[in-house]
Amino acid sequence: MPLSRSLLSRRISNSFRFHQGETTTAPESESIPPPSNMAGSSSWSAMLPELLGEIIRRVEETEDRWPQRRDVVTCACVSKKWREITHDFARSSLNSGKITFPSCLKLPGPRDFSNQCLIKRNKKTSTFYLYLALTPSFTDKGKFLLAARRFRTGAYTEYIISLDADDFSQGSNAYVGKLRSDFLGTNFTVYDSQPPHNGAKPSNGKASRRFASKQISPQVPAGNFEVGHVSYKFNLLKSRGPRRMVSTLRCPSPSPSSSSAGLSSDQKPCDVTKIMKKPNKDGSSLTILKNKAPRWHEHLQCWCLNFHGRVTVASVKNFQLVATVDQSQPSGKGDEETVLLQFGKVGDDTFTMDYRQPLSAFQAFAICLTSFGTKLACE
């Protein structure tokens, strides 16, 4: 791929230009094979591992945001050797919540801050697009991450989530999961295309057949595995207040497994203190989130939440999710102030989505999709 190598050559040249005090030029040596001996192999692949590792380390550390982070992806495209080393450095920084490869969309977000995203809605096609925000502006698209399209089938509605904004087939390589609602649109089930743990069984039905999705985890055939539920509470008395919701998510088992998209034991998305978890027989755990209770503003005569400027339009769809705290913990109340996911309206068809650990971009997007649509029994 001459284009990638050309771009990378300029990037490496600039990197060493600004680090001349740390690098030296090696003298010519007879141990270096002549060009004729390298005709059958790439000079990029023949680079010394120490030098190659230093180059990729610098690129990975300095290019921590998109669009500059595409240089890290370029490194992984040079050769197999470059790809292995790049993946090693990318895996070592998983706790940072950086999004580099498609597999990062199913890994937990940052621990100490939120990944800020935008959701764009196309009402005509019932399609929703998730972008990673690159600037504070709500009008900039940012970097495309995922897309979802709503399909109505019989008594339920499905949202097919894909890496490709033009391909929503469950048999596609771009298929990453789906969201299914009941008839009333108050109960939702989240399905992942990859098993959440070893021994997980796909859901029953023809939609659970195994697919050839390879962009998230090439070694694991895709299917439909239940990984979470979102429920909206009924409001039959029509009392004042926003929607009330509870989200129950399945977290990977503590032991590392290949089915967790490269997730290691010290990077599991349940690594948040005092979050209530219910252990399962399969070794995984359920993380329970609930919407943060708003306060009534007497002057404005409306329910209010502090979105810190990330939501500008009042809407029943707006919400913030916090951890359900174990009441046996004496200091547990403090965790209810940490917003793990917030979603809100900033335009007619534009919404913000900010998430952090233990949620992944895929899980956060699925939860936000449940807010679209009318829920007469809950409002």
UniProtKB/Swiss-Prot annotation:
SS bonds (residue pairs): none
**One Gene Ontology cellular component:** plastid
What InterPro entries is this protein classified in? Tubby-like_C, Tubby_C, Tubby_C_CS
Q: Which family does it belong to?
A: Belongs to the TUB family.
The segment(s) forming the F-box domain are 42-97
CDD domains assigned to the protein according to its UniProt record, in alphabetical order: F-box_AtTLP-like
Q: What is the primary gene name for this protein?
A: TULP7
The record, for PROSITE patterns, names: TUB_1, TUB_2
Q: For the region Disordered, give the residue spans.
A: 18-41, 193-212, 248-278
Q: Name one Pfam family in it.
A: Tub
Q: Name one GO biological process term.
A: response to fungus
> What is the protein's given name?
Tubby-like F-box protein 7
On the tree of life, the source organism's domain of life is: Eukaryota
Polar residues composition bias: residue spans: 18-28
Entry comment describing in which tissues the protein is expressed: Ubiquitous.
MF terms (GO), sorted A to Z: DNA-binding transcription factor activity; transcription cis-regulatory region binding
